[in-house]
Amino acid sequence: HALYDSIENLGKRNIKMVFLLLVGYPTETLEDYEQTLQLIKWSHNYKNLIEIRINPAMILPNTPLEKYHWYDSIEHWKYKNEDGELDFAERYRRWDEANNLSLSLGYNIFPKHKEQKRLLDEKLKKYYETSKL
Protein backbone atom coordinates (compact mmCIF):
# COMPACT_ATOMS: atom_id res chain seq x y z
CA HIS A 1 0.00 0.00 0.00
CA ALA A 2 1.56 3.29 -1.12
CA LEU A 3 0.49 5.29 1.94
CA TYR A 4 2.06 2.83 4.36
CA ASP A 5 5.23 2.67 2.25
CA SER A 6 5.47 6.46 2.28
CA ILE A 7 5.04 6.65 6.05
CA GLU A 8 7.70 4.00 6.53
CA ASN A 9 10.13 5.73 4.15
CA LEU A 10 9.65 9.10 5.86
CA GLY A 11 9.89 7.55 9.31
CA LYS A 12 13.15 5.74 8.54
CA ARG A 13 14.61 9.08 7.46
CA ASN A 14 13.35 10.86 10.62
CA ILE A 15 11.18 13.22 8.59
CA LYS A 16 8.32 14.76 10.55
CA MET A 17 4.78 14.15 9.34
CA VAL A 18 1.36 15.63 9.98
CA PHE A 19 -1.73 13.47 9.57
CA LEU A 20 -4.81 15.56 8.78
CA LEU A 21 -7.66 13.11 9.25
CA LEU A 22 -11.35 13.72 8.64
CA VAL A 23 -13.94 11.38 10.11
CA GLY A 24 -17.66 11.27 9.46
CA TYR A 25 -17.55 12.56 5.90
CA PRO A 26 -20.63 11.77 3.76
CA THR A 27 -19.30 8.75 1.88
CA GLU A 28 -17.34 7.33 4.82
CA THR A 29 -18.39 3.76 5.54
CA LEU A 30 -17.72 1.91 8.75
CA GLU A 31 -14.98 0.05 6.86
CA ASP A 32 -13.37 3.37 5.83
CA TYR A 33 -13.44 4.54 9.43
CA GLU A 34 -11.90 1.29 10.67
CA GLN A 35 -9.11 1.72 8.10
CA THR A 36 -8.41 5.14 9.59
CA LEU A 37 -8.05 3.54 13.03
CA GLN A 38 -5.78 0.86 11.54
CA LEU A 39 -3.58 3.58 10.02
CA ILE A 40 -3.24 5.22 13.43
CA LYS A 41 -2.35 1.89 15.05
CA TRP A 42 0.06 0.83 12.31
CA SER A 43 1.94 4.15 12.28
CA HIS A 44 2.60 4.26 16.03
CA ASN A 45 6.23 3.14 15.54
CA TYR A 46 6.81 6.64 14.16
CA LYS A 47 4.60 8.45 16.70
CA ASN A 48 7.40 10.81 17.76
CA LEU A 49 7.61 12.07 14.18
CA ILE A 50 3.86 12.38 13.61
CA GLU A 51 1.42 15.06 14.69
CA ILE A 52 -2.19 13.99 14.27
CA ARG A 53 -5.06 16.39 13.66
CA ILE A 54 -8.46 14.73 13.53
CA ASN A 55 -11.64 16.62 12.70
CA PRO A 56 -15.26 15.56 12.35
CA ALA A 57 -16.91 16.51 9.07
CA MET A 58 -18.76 19.81 9.30
CA ILE A 59 -20.91 21.65 6.78
CA LEU A 60 -19.60 24.98 5.53
CA PRO A 61 -22.09 27.38 3.94
CA ASN A 62 -22.15 27.65 0.15
CA THR A 63 -20.15 24.47 -0.46
CA PRO A 64 -21.16 21.45 -2.55
CA LEU A 65 -21.48 19.40 0.64
CA GLU A 66 -24.25 21.71 1.81
CA LYS A 67 -26.43 20.32 -1.00
CA TYR A 68 -26.19 16.74 0.28
CA HIS A 69 -27.34 17.06 3.87
CA TRP A 70 -30.45 17.85 5.81
CA TYR A 71 -30.99 19.34 9.23
CA ASP A 72 -32.45 17.36 12.09
CA SER A 73 -32.38 20.50 14.23
CA ILE A 74 -31.31 24.09 13.76
CA GLU A 75 -27.58 23.45 14.21
CA HIS A 76 -27.18 19.80 13.38
CA TRP A 77 -27.21 17.90 10.15
CA LYS A 78 -27.01 14.33 9.00
CA TYR A 79 -26.85 12.41 5.76
CA LYS A 80 -27.28 8.90 4.49
CA ASN A 81 -24.63 6.66 3.00
CA GLU A 82 -24.48 2.93 2.38
CA ASP A 83 -24.14 2.26 6.14
CA GLY A 84 -27.24 4.31 7.00
CA GLU A 85 -27.58 7.75 8.55
CA LEU A 86 -24.52 9.52 9.88
CA ASP A 87 -25.58 12.17 12.38
CA PHE A 88 -23.64 14.52 14.63
CA ALA A 89 -23.55 12.05 17.53
CA GLU A 90 -21.93 9.35 15.36
CA ARG A 91 -19.45 11.79 13.80
CA TYR A 92 -18.54 12.96 17.30
CA ARG A 93 -18.18 9.36 18.53
CA ARG A 94 -15.79 8.57 15.67
CA TRP A 95 -13.80 11.75 16.29
CA ASP A 96 -13.54 11.04 20.01
CA GLU A 97 -12.56 7.39 19.51
CA ALA A 98 -9.85 8.24 16.97
CA ASN A 99 -8.44 10.97 19.22
CA ASN A 100 -8.48 8.73 22.29
CA LEU A 101 -6.70 6.00 20.34
CA SER A 102 -4.06 8.51 19.21
CA LEU A 103 -3.55 9.74 22.77
CA SER A 104 -3.34 6.19 24.16
CA LEU A 105 -0.62 5.34 21.63
CA GLY A 106 1.41 8.42 22.60
CA TYR A 107 1.02 10.50 19.45
CA ASN A 108 1.52 14.24 19.37
CA ILE A 109 -1.97 15.56 18.75
CA PHE A 110 -3.26 18.90 17.56
CA PRO A 111 -2.20 21.47 20.20
CA LYS A 112 -5.72 22.90 20.49
CA HIS A 113 -7.34 19.46 20.93
CA LYS A 114 -8.66 20.22 24.43
CA GLU A 115 -10.39 23.38 23.25
CA GLN A 116 -11.76 21.57 20.21
CA LYS A 117 -13.09 18.79 22.48
CA ARG A 118 -14.74 21.31 24.81
CA LEU A 119 -16.53 22.99 21.90
CA LEU A 120 -17.63 19.66 20.42
CA ASP A 121 -18.83 18.46 23.83
CA GLU A 122 -21.01 21.57 24.04
CA LYS A 123 -22.38 20.93 20.56
CA LEU A 124 -23.08 17.29 21.42
CA LYS A 125 -24.95 18.31 24.56
CA LYS A 126 -27.02 20.79 22.56
CA TYR A 127 -27.59 18.14 19.90
CA TYR A 128 -29.08 15.75 22.44
CA GLU A 129 -31.17 18.54 23.95
CA THR A 130 -32.63 19.57 20.58
CA SER A 131 -32.80 16.28 18.67
CA LYS A 132 -35.50 13.68 18.65
CA LEU A 133 -33.35 10.65 19.36
Region spans (language model):
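A structural motif corresponding to the C-terminal lobe/cap of the Radical SAM core domain
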Residues: 1-133
